[in-house]
Amino acid sequence: MKKLLLNTLIGLALLTCQTSFAQKTKAKFSPIKVETPARPANQQDVIQLVTPKLETVRVGFIGLGMRGPGAVERWTHIPGTQIVALCDLLPERVENAQKILEKAGLPKAASYAGDEKAWKKLCERDDIDVVYIATDWKHHADMGVYAMEHGKHVAIEVPAAMTLDEIWKLINTSEKTRKHCMQLENCVYDFFELTSLNMAQQGVFGEVLHVEGAYIHNLEDFWPYYWNNWRMDYNQKHRGDVYATHGMGPACQVLNIHRGDRMKTLVAMDTKAVNGPAYIKKSTGKEVKDFQNGDQTTTLIRTENGKTMLIQHNVMTPRPYSRMYQVVGADGYASKYPIEEYCLRPTQVDSNDVPNHEKLNAHGSVSEDVKKALMAKYKDPIHKELEETAKKVGGHGGMDYIMDYRLVYCLRNGLPLDMDVYDLAEWCCMAELTRLSIENGSAPVEVPDFTRGGWNKVQGYRHAFAE
């Protein structure tokens, strides 16, 4: 009897320890939560926002350094536009942009330069519909908010916001003013990525389960050209994936993020910083002991519907350029780097459209002939319309032109834009959320629902077209 009682007590003690340990373990691994501010009264979301048609889209450009002049050049080729104003801190940059207009046979635009607040005067004009912002990162959000407050739609270079506070300001201003706030993410218009998106939408890969994306681009040849060294300075002071949008954009569109699914939790980790401090030592002679941004940052994300994403950032080490675009479906696979390839079950293609379809298998890439046939069949309608012109005009192989053209097209036809302010938020929030994860031992971090309840209102990502 004593032995039975002793065994019972031991069993209860072990059960109590196990329960206590499980409770502690559960508490230990609860995701870090960040605040989601309540939507202000009398304010609605801007999902599928449409605004009155614009016969002519009148634009003003702020920032004419590395990206701005190319945008001005592209807009000279887009019908239904008028370049009204040009702004940069340096007067010579404005003059160089004026020469682009002159070469295109267009009238001179109003000039704003030489004053750090000159951009506000551009935003305050009453003859501009869109303010196109291509400055350094730290000015993006403030300029976007000010432009919307003065009745303008805004198009902001990547990343459009660097903190959650900036993101919420852009969201609330867009919702309050009912103005479009689009991030200028060009990679979603890449020919392979847009074709693969169309294939995913038509079920070629089966249910998409996992996607990958990245910005892998050694910038050692480019660092000297950033105004006042702003980009290296930002990397020196900030940890985390500070430039995630090129990988995030195509990945989120394939997974229908805030169009039937949402990002729920992320975990991030980074390597130590080696090349950043070495570059500063080589270029300035100064020792840097607290360089924040690791040479490589890796992030894993899980969605509400049980899908996963892998995102990388590396601008420091020697590696071939890559956005690491991959789509992993239950019945097929797409990958852009290092070579463009597909892998499909034979059941996923029509024998009338694809040669030698019976030779397809689930463990090897399709042949070049099959790949060409697939890309021809599933070429996106946007590319069917614009590919020839886009490749002539240029801008990262044409995708920059398509990005700008689609912005103008949607505004002229009163359609929802291809990318809304919630896309901007989801792709830019990686900067702060990955830092939070890394600084807390790679702990899970909850991703806010930037739509504040509207992520499931639209089912599936789609481009809008005029009837």
From Swiss-Prot:
It holds the Pfam family GFO_IDH_MocA. SUPFAM superfamilies: Glyceraldehyde-3-phosphate dehydrogenase-like, C-terminal domain (SSF55347), NAD(P)-binding Rossmann-fold domains (SSF51735). NAD(+) binds at M66, R67, D88, W137, K138, H139, H140, E157, V158, N186, Y243. Binds 1 NAD(+) per subunit. The NAD(+) cannot dissociate. Its EC number is 3.2.1.-. It comes from the Bacteria. This is Glycosyl hydrolase family 109 protein 1. It comes from Bacteroides thetaiotaomicron (strain ATCC 29148 / DSM 2079 / JCM 5827 / CCUG 10774 / NCTC 10582 / VPI-5482 / E50). The lineage of its organism: Bacteria, Pseudomonadati, Bacteroidota, Bacteroidia, Bacteroidales.
